Amino acid sequence: MTDLDFSSFLQKQFILLGEMHGVRENIEILKMFIEWATQLEEPVVVCLEWPDQLTEEINDYLLGVGLLRWSSWEFIKHKDGRVSQEHIAFLEWLKDFNLHLVKKTTVQCFDVETGGWNERDKKMANILLKRKSERVRVIAIMGNFHAKKEKFFLDQEEHIPLGYYLPTASTTTIKLDYLSGSFFNKSQKEFINRETNDDTELLLKESQDPDYDFVLLIPRAHPVSLLK
């Protein structure tokens, strides 16, 4: 993938990546941000929209003191694209990547089970906000609605997203915007937002939408692979 200019994010503690679940390129983008952030002074915390109780198991695995028992994870049954063969391969990559780092990258899972959308997003935000007083850089990837900075209405109901609760001055929100392709969420689906060609490259630009600070245009999306 094309190298990106990360200079706009140097002073930001919280970097939110708003994804469409079930796209393989999400993981490649996340890896690019990790590779950039680990060159800086602060330790990096990678935050995943996975059940928070998996945090300890995953970090033990990254440190080489535990196994990754993903086949027992209940949430893989949702088949909503948040976890896949590519995500497990990503954790294997992160474990190997960590071997060469003085300050190890850790993972924080932040999904919680609650009654409603707004309550869930507030609780997920609180998990990230616990890191505010720590000298760390947080890279969090989540569904793009959760990464929004502003309240919004959907089906005539007000939604207050995770991104709304984070400190504006130290947070940047980036929407991953795919031009065309396929994704897997319950089933494989195809879409075309805009025409593209083989020469189209990644493009990071300031967002015209007040919900996000930046938009990262991605030429083509490919679906993730189901865990078996």
Predicted regions and their residues:
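Compositional signal for N-terminal targeting/processing segments
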Residues: M1-K228
